Amino acid sequence: MFILASASLSRKKLLRGHRFRVVPSGVREVRRKTLQATCVTNARLKADAVARRFPTEWVLAADTMVAYGGRIYGKPRDRKAAVRLLRALAGQTHTLGTGVVLQKGRFRIVKFVTSKVTLHDDPPVEKIVARTDPTQYAGGYAIREKNDPLIRRIDGSRSNVIGLPMEFLEPLLRKLEREAPAPVKRGRKVPLKGYILV
């Protein structure tokens, strides 16, 4: 059992099969100089906010952003902004990054994962934006299972583009469900390869 510090429907769907409850963090997102610093900082802020309220429970927090042309993009403020962004990304490859934090009290496991996303050359942007709420998604878009009218190719984790890198999270969450890990002292190695204690 853990707490998901997000109200994202996409993340809740990805976590089906796991026992969790939702407690949105209510944290205002910040921007840093790099995609990794931005995503990881926001995920840590979200995890901290919820972990302070529930210090004995595991908290899962995440933040997803898009980087293109030297700029970092989160959720567009409205449909017009989403249309402008998607037109700029059309036919191009951009980087989507997700910072993930799994935290219990003061102890954190941190992961940052990127995927490369290439859009079609001339996607029906207005139609896509009209039938979804682009203000709920980083970059202003969600992906379909098949025949996506917007996305031509994804290099890397597909679930990461949806909202969580499940290839990395799944074994970790299963391990937490099987075991009741004792607190890990700062500075000791994490018994899960590929994760960082910070």
Where are these regions (language model features)?
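Short, acidic/turn-prone active-site loops that include or flank metal/cofactor-
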Residues: 24-31
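N-terminal beta1-alpha1 ligand-phosphate binding loop
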Residues: 1-20, 24
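Anionic-ligand binding patches
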Residues: 2-3, 34-198
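Short, glycine/serine-rich, charged loops/turns that create anion-binding
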Residues: 9, 27, 107
